């Protein structure tokens, strides 16, 4: 079973969204853009237990907390605002096809659309497939002062006109939707509370049959007082004092200690899963295990459930990278991609992002204050899948999540420009720090690759800034750079090292070389004479050779850290200043009114 369309209205931070998927979906984007809200919306619609809690929704599940629309005419009642979550499901299991037969519609595979009423008779296997549309509607009921939500079949031919049939919980269980929240699932995943992963697993395995009756019977037979004789006089004294106020007709012992309240609900909360991971360790409650181990245990449960229902399980997982080491992140991603029908994953981790193809990666962004849009990364032209996978962990994934990217052609610039930016920001409070503004730096490894990556980032909606060496280029080549770069900086030097040698004062270059010698660097290896030359030209030539031979060491960045304000290379400084104009500091409106503080 797969979700191919998802529509969301007035739910949490999303006023409206219409998203299309084709299989697995990695959801990436900035914080608070709506990644988790998509997973929560899927849970509200497909999760079998979400709507059974009371209340199923609350005030802040509505967009901006608005669950009532003010009356347009004075004296009239306000109108309830509705939450709507709609999904179109394909690849339905045989059991769903059978039990939901009258609600089925047809989906055109190639054109990715729902067949209209007149086209259904012409539906052909291989061209169209059965599909199921569901909708969850939530609203506030002023009469009862309650929040309600219910899931319906959108195609309800047997319902009264204007109404829709309700989707029962036993049908929702057939969908096999499982939601692993990054920070919330672990605390109850291995408990027996309703809807927990262990509870779902026991239900699927039919292990719960007779569990509670047998457990309650055994607990009733447990004589706690017999193992603690010192309790006897205490309980007797309590009974004697109780009889002075409340006459008791029961003969013999009137008080009893049990380990729980002997109800199913209380046992669900008190029963605990214990775990031992080492030979020298006794079993402890699962919450006491390491966080990484706990999350891995949760994955183990999820995989168990997926294998029990291989044709229907849909996973939604938030940020698997939280407290989980890189190799486990990769294993989680690989498992979801190969063993589940469909997985929705939110992540900022390059170890997760690199496992998904561009066709399965969606960059979320706000088109307006509350409208959410998703761009498939594969639609960002100019980058082959091999390049995408190769560079994903080298900064590509970080840049995709930002607002702008500085693209350079080598590691010297990659290390040096961030240092120069921090120096400028430290001296001028009017500058918005580039990292906070969402500007990353990306090493394209050669100038010829800059247009390719710039085109990719530009298609994702990022501002692109290129900084590269001068080179003989014809008009066609120059046009490629200009077309995809918001700031197209081809500086006049043949290398960044030459720029530093030409624009940083010789006194600073000499001091830097002397500092290297004093630090104990292998002077012979880097061909630095133990006594520095007095000729300025020789110092400049030496600095170019030294910096060129140590690109990975970041010595250019170290030189810039030592420069005073007046000593920094003007060409690079002016380039960064152009970028700052794209990202000014946010305007902070001072507080007004009675709460405002005056000096």
Give the positions of each predicted feature.
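Switch/communication elements of ASCE P-loop NTPase nucleotide-binding domains
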Residues: 1-47, 273-398, 570, 581-599
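Conserved catalytic network of the ASCE P-loop NTPase/AAA+ motor domain
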Residues: 19-20, 30, 75-80, 125-129, ...
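Conserved beta-strand position immediately N-terminal to the Walker
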Residues: 24-27, 178, 405
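Conserved P-loop NTP-binding catalytic core
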Residues: 40-128
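Short glycine-/polar-rich loops that comprise or flank the Walker A/P-loop
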Residues: 81-85, 130-134, 173-177, 312, ...
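Electropositive, glycine-dotted interaction segments
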Residues: 92-211
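Extended helical coiled-coil dimerization/tether regions that scaffold
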Residues: 189-192, 199-297, 301-313, 476
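Acidic, Mg2+-coordinating catalytic modules of nucleic-acid enzymes
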Residues: 394-407, 411-599
């Amino acid at each position: 079973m797969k979700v191919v369309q998802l529509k969301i209205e007035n739910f949490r931070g999303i006023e409206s969204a219409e998203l299309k998927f084709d299989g697995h979906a990695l959801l990436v984007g900035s914080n608070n853009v709506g990644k988790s809200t998509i997973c929560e919306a899927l849970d509200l619609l497909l999760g079998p237990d979400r709507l059974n809690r009371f209340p199923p929704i609350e005030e802040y599940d509505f967009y901006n907390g608005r669950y009532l629309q003010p009356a347009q005419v004075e004296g009239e009642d306000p109108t309830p605002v509705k939450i709507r979550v709609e999904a179109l499901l394909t690849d339905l299991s045989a059991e769903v096809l059978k039990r939901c037969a009258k609600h089925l519609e047809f989906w055109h595979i190639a054109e990715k659309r729902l067949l209209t009423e007149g086209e259904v008779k012409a539906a052909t296997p291989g061209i169209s497939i059965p599909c199921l549309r569901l909708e969850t509607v939530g609203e506030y009921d002023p009469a009862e002062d309650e929040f309600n939500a219910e899931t319906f079949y959108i195609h309800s031919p047997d319902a009264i006109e204007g109404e829709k049939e309700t989707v029962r919980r036993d049908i929702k269980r057939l969908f096999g939707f499982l939601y692993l929240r990054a920070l919330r699932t672990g605390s109850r995943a291995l408990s027996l509370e309703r809807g927990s992963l262990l509870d779902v697993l026991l239900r699927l395995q039919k292990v719960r049959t007779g569990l509670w009756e047998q457990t309650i019977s055994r607990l009733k037979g447990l004589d706690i007082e017999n193992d603690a004789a010192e309790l006897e006089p205490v309980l007797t004294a309590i009974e004697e004092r109780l009889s002075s106020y409340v006459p008791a007709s029961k003969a013999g012992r009137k008080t009893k200690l049990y380990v729980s309240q002997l109800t199913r609900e209380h046992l669900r909360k008190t029963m605990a899963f214990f775990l031992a991971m080492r030979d020298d360790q006794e079993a402890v409650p699962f919450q006491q295990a390491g966080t990484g181990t706990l999350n891995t245990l949760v994955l183990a449960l999820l995989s168990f459930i997926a294998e029990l229902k291989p044709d229907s399980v849909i996973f939604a997982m938030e940020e698997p990278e939280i407290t989980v080491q890189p190799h486990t992140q990769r294993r989680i991603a690989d498992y979801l991609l190969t063993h589940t029908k469909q997985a929705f994953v939110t992540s900022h981790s390059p170890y997760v992002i690199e496992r998904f193809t561009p066709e399965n990666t969606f960059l979320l962004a706000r088109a307006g204050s509350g409208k959410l849009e998703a761009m498939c990364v594969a639609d960002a032209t100019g980058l082959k899948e091999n390049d995408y996978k190769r560079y994903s962990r080298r900064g590509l994934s970080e840049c995709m999540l930002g607002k702008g990217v500085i693209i350079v052609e080598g590691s010297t610039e990659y290390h040096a420009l961030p240092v120069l930016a921090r120096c400028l920001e430290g001296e001028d409070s009017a500058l918005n720090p580039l990292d906070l503004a969402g500007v990353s730096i990306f090493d394209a490894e050669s100038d010829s690759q800059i247009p390719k990556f710039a085109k990719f980032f530009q298609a994702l909606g990022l501002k692109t800034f290129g900084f590269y060496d001068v080179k003989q280029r014809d008009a066609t080549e120059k046009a490629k750079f200009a077309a995809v770069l918001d700031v197209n900086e081809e500086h006049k030097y043949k290398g960044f090292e030459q720029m530093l040698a030409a624009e940083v004062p010789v006194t600073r270059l000499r001091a830097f070389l002397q500092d290297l010698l004093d630090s104990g660097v292998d002077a012979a290896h880097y061909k630095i004479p133990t006594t520095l030359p007095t000729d300025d030209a020789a110092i400049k030539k030496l600095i170019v050779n030294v910096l060129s031979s140590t690109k990975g060491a970041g010595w250019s960045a170290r030189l810039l850290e030592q420069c005073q304000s007046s000593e920094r290379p003007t060409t690079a400084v002016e380039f960064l200043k152009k970028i700052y104009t794209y990202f000014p500091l946010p305007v902070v409106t001072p507080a007004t009114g009675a709460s405002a503080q005056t000096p």
